[in-house]
Amino acid sequence: YKGDWVNDKKQGWGTYDWQDGSRYEGQWNGDYMHGQGVFYYANGDKYDGQWENDHKQGPGIYYFADGSKYDGQWENGKKQGQGTYQWKSGSRYEGQWKNDCMHGQGTLYHPDGSKYKGQWVNDKQQGEGIYYYANGCRYEGQWFDDKKQGQGTFTWVNGDKYVGQWMNDRMHGQGIYYHADGNKYEGQWVNAVSYTHLT
């Protein structure tokens, strides 16, 4: 350790090097990383932000060795609150976090132009949400475990629309299919196949 001491404790500004190659440069309080500081991990990751009693706390940016990045709030060492995660693939999530997971309200942008905007539970699209497809199609409704499940509306680019129940990403249950030409089919669906058509 190189830095300031007060009463035999690391206090103020200092640098600490671990045997595994990790390093912290920043503020200390009573032997704890506390305040503003940068932690360089042995695996190439880096965290630049606020600390409280050796834990990431408050605003901070975590740079992953693979090129991914998280910029947002932390609590007790975990992503918590509002934050943006950028994957090396080009995908990006902007929204709420809880206990290191996408949780609450948020939007996930994909490199192909598609995006999901809605509710999340433990890294899964779950609750109410809208998925905008890159080809112009759109689904608005309920989700469970990253799949369309419950009540929802799917609109195709050509103007066709399905309003009804979904299960496991497929039209399943009671629903109405509206054709762009004005025709409609109403009835029961099983795994995206309509059986009881009523015109």
What would you call each of these model-derived segments?
Residues 32, 39-41, 64, 144:
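Aromatic (phenylalanine/tyrosine) cluster motif
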Residues 1-11, 23-34, 46-58, 69-80, ...:
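Conserved anchor residues at repeat-unit boundaries in beta-strand-based tandem repeats, strongest
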Residues 196-199:
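Conserved small/polar residues in nucleotide/adenosyl-binding loops
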